[in-house]
């Protein structure tokens, strides 16, 4: 028996007993029912009270009416009493009558701390209801009150347009969240909207259906910046919540890639890390030196991300905050974090000597006996010695990249001469300066 049924049954028993004892004085009962006499004659079409102050309606035949609407929408129950401040089930539908006996119609009403909606005929609304501003849901299984501040998995309203193909698994029900106003949480000015609920971010479409997987929240550049990933499996965390931390997944279909699974990193609001690509001074491109430091097991690692939102690996060209360009090394694809190795594998597969400063930036200039350009050691390639000009200074280096100081010898009688001073800079030699050896950068997948 439902809450309302128990109330109705109990009230009927009590009222029946009271009716038999309280109707006295001018009240008279015969085989047809109760009448009220004034000066010995019955009254018609009016209200009269008993000794308890309860109101009863006398119909056109003078007899007390029971279980019916009377007098401009008021209702009398099975004992004849006017219903006030309580629920009544009429023809299988629930109705509520106020202190005045008036029925609640065409509005919402807070009753015992809970909100209810009523149709214009006074019937309590159950299921989905649109009040002209937004959708609410009145849960018949919870007494018919409007849901507030809670999740509910439901079939959508008939007026909602659902793209069932957008869901990998669909049993006809979807998750909705109802705010403290009772309104369903939904996107209003875009296809999808991200909302924080209890400090956790979720995405909803224009119907209010919770989304999972990749969801495009906004149009922005780079494209990945407008996406979030909402957990589509409980193994990833709270189902439907914006993913936080590392994630291995296929990229959004809008983003061109090799089609392989990629790594992504999301902050505590679900925003993916991404990089900014800029033209470089050598006709190629570089990434802005905007790093992401991530701590794991008390160790902090430095990452740089592509415009597609993937951590870079290998040798990468970056633009520093001062506008200059240089190289950085982020290890193997399995590492994909800043490394300070010296003998590294370049993008073309060649092993080469590199030099990096304490921040991981490739050195340009002389350092520790070697000459570097964007971190790459400059060395003689076609000869044992070569001149290279870096930062306006021309140095003499051997085929190991080491700066040769105080050198003053001819290669052979009558051939080109190499000569350097105490700093290893060119000092009168006649050999031509070689073209700088450029780093071979890793192409990011």
Mark where each language-model region is:
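Extracellular adhesion/carbohydrate-binding repeat motifs centered on closely spaced tryptophans
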Residues: 2-445
